[in-house]
Amino acid sequence: MAKPLTDGERRKQISVRGLAGLGDVAEVRKSFNRHLHFTLVKDRNVATRRDYYLALAHTVRDHLVGRWIRTQQRYYERDPKRIYYLSLEFYMGRTLQNTMVNLGLQNACDEAIYQLGLDLEELEEIEEDAGLGNGGLGRLAACFLDSMATLGLAAYGYGIRYEFGIFNQKIVNGWQVEEADDWLRYGNPWEKARPEYMLPVHFYGRVEHSPEGVRWLDTQVVLAMPYDTPVPGYKNDTVNTMRLWSAKAPNDFKLHDFNVGGYIEAVLDRNLAENISRVLYPNDNFFEGKELRLKQEYFVVAATLQDIIRRFKSSKFGCRDPVRTSFETFPDKVAIQLNDTHPALAIPELMRILVDVEKVDWGKAWEITKKTCAYTNHTVLPEALERWPVSMFEKLLPRHLDIIYAINQRHLDHVAALFPGDVDRLRRMSVIEEGDCKRINMAHLCVIGSHAVNGVARIHSEIVRQSVFKDFYELEPEKFQNKTNGITPRRWLLLCNPGLAETIVERIGEDFLTDLSQLKKLLPLVGDEALIRDVAQVKQENKVKFSAFLEKQYGVKVNPSSMFDVHVKRIHEYKRQLLNCLHVVTLYNRIKKDPTQAFVPRTVMIGGKAAPGYHMAKKIIKLVTSIGDIVNHDPIVGDRLKVIFLENYRVSLAEKVIPAADLSQQISTAGTEASGTGNMKFMLNGALTIGTMDGANVEMAEEAGAENLFIFGLRVEDVEALDRKGYNAHEYYNHLPELQQAVDQINSGFFSPREPDCFKDVVNMLLNHDRFKVFADYEAYVACQAQVDQLYRNPKEWTKKVIRNIACSGKFSSDRTITEYARDIWGAEPPALQTPPPSLPRD
């Protein structure tokens, strides 16, 4: 049993966490009790902490369902345009606290749970993260769902219910080891299975042409079982749906291949079909080309399009003709957003349904498809672009291959007519890439089949137009747009940093939570002594709390008055965790050289997962942990420098570390990070940014003033110029003694005395084939870090910059991003009228 709390400690739990909301404490207690006994069939003598969490989850869920049902009824009655957000990743994190925040139930639940002798925060920690994403792309989808619900859009997230999400990361002897993420082991109280909407998905087979049309025959069928998760808007009684598909084998699966006695084998082989939704592919910004992954991509698209068309056909105003559905109005009623190229098969699949099944003629079907679909590009790295072998399509999706060939032929005919004789342009713009292995370029398919293509930050959209899709931009410039990414301020401020949220509410009220641009009202208060004191105090409390967490979780003691220098994101060469490592080694060498000098104490925290097959990324983790082993145990260094690798970085850990950070590292090579969203979370939570002019950093500097960030390094133009000249890492190595010393130490085994050769391949890469030019930015980076130290010595000036950054972060709300998508791409207006709460009559 936990030791009894003092009265003072108890009262701390009754603080205004977030804002006053609805909910009656007695009712919450009653509901909790009922669920513990009737849903979980436990009494207090045998109930575990997890039972208490589940009882609370069911209690909170009860407050959702009335609003959920009411929202769907309202959509049926009003028949607004539906938005379908298709993504292979939704990185949702935990649901309990977010639901309490959005329904305004947090205070009632906190008090009720306290009265029952339990601790709300302890119960929240029991929930598993829904880790159905790798990083930024999946988390963006989750933020977008929150914003679409908060804006009252009739939106649906569609994806896959992976049985195993992103792996859990363990660090063993400094190396990453992956463990399966069995997140559904104890059940998921937030989802509702919908077997009545199960749908068939076809694979393999052959194509038959006849006078009646084209048929796809002799296919293998897998069933798609939908699981619905509610997505509540912020205090607006709207609850949208995220529908995730799970693969099920049909009951007759393989039983028609019945050889004598083959029954058991056939039943065991059901696993093969059900493997489609077994596991999330753990690659971020890297294309692997596995058949199972292509199956996943078609699986989600085929099930979702059937569902969309079913809903369109049964909608009040969707189809006027009683005999046969008219698809004329389809693009007026349906918008499909493709989150990267992963759901690109929506384009040929919609064509297949319209042409083969609904008998719409090709030209009309193509017009409908283009008007319906829009594509978001998320990366410029060539190794990330999806290029599937034609041979794989031929086997797995023969009809779709035919359709893609036909789409490509018409497209190339159009280009040839506009640019006669320009054969190279045809080659560059084709969906089919010729060569030893013919491939399908999914990005080209998306651009051709969509009415809008957007990048995710201004600089990225410019690169998309001028480089990645240059030829396509020349063909249809009006198609290309920018939609700078954003984050939901509900999860990324109110939920994770209630102290800061409360400090802001005291100054400007709470409207900023649904209109983040109102943070501008803090600008006149940048010099306000009381605000400076409060903001600094909240940050210090967050640091103390995170320090306690680190000690409990990892057994590491850190100095909470040191600068918390945080670099958390997927481990990838382009994100340049190696540049951070070189700075840490340089700081270490400076302390060792002159231990008496005044030194700003730093705790450097690096966290993130490496793709299991990405050797260099795994080496980078080993390097960070090895540097930590030496630095953290050096008595001369003492408390002045600590290096910590944050194991198993995920949404729930981000919610703890981001509010505690002083410095946010956003140091990708200019022109490689499409946008980034971690940068925005740190800005909103009162950290200052050290970064390159890349992704959304550019717009952050524009909003807050470049002098309020620590900007360093090559710009995109400089990187291009250096590429033309030829990047020579040896020049920097030979001319910068501190860089040379650091590199030599890493190379010689100074940080890996038991394996002196451990990092030779890393150094070899840095010196001889570093695509991301780490050494070229080293000098500017180290100088910029010295400016960081300089400002940190003056806490008041530091905090003024923090307040200015917070005040200027309003642009980076996903509410603003989604409002722009709705206006410029989807042609959907957020409704003027709110959904009435379940307690009121429907209209």
From Swiss-Prot:
Keyword Phosphoprotein: yes
Gene3D superfamilies: Glycogen Phosphorylase B (3.40.50.2000)
Residue ranges of the region described as Pyridoxal 5'-phosphate: 677-678
Activity regulation information from UniProt: Activity of phosphorylase is controlled both by allosteric means (through the non-covalent binding of metabolites) and by covalent modification. Thus AMP allosterically activates, whereas ATP, ADP, and glucose-6-phosphate allosterically inhibit, phosphorylase B.
EC number(s) reported in the record: 2.4.1.1
One Pfam family, short name: Phosphorylase
Enzyme class: transferase
Presence of keyword Glycosyltransferase: yes
Alphabetized PROSITE patterns for the sequence: PHOSPHORYLASE
Residues annotated with Phosphoserine modification: 15
PTM statement from Swiss-Prot or TrEMBL: Phosphorylation of Ser-15 converts phosphorylase B (unphosphorylated) to phosphorylase A.
Obligatory cofactor(s): pyridoxal 5'-phosphate
Positions marked as site (Involved in the association of subunits): 109, 143
Site (May be involved in allosteric control): 156
GO molecular function: glycogen phosphorylase activity; pyridoxal phosphate binding
One Gene Ontology term from the biological process aspect of the record: glycogen catabolic process
Subunit relationships: Homodimer. Dimers associate into a tetramer to form the enzymatically active phosphorylase A.
Biological role: Glycogen phosphorylase that regulates glycogen mobilization. Phosphorylase is an important allosteric enzyme in carbohydrate metabolism. Enzymes from different sources differ in their regulatory mechanisms and in their natural substrates. However, all known phosphorylases share catalytic and structural properties.
Name the UniProt record assigns to this protein: Glycogen phosphorylase, brain form
Organism for this UniProt entry: Ovis aries
Gene designation: PYGB
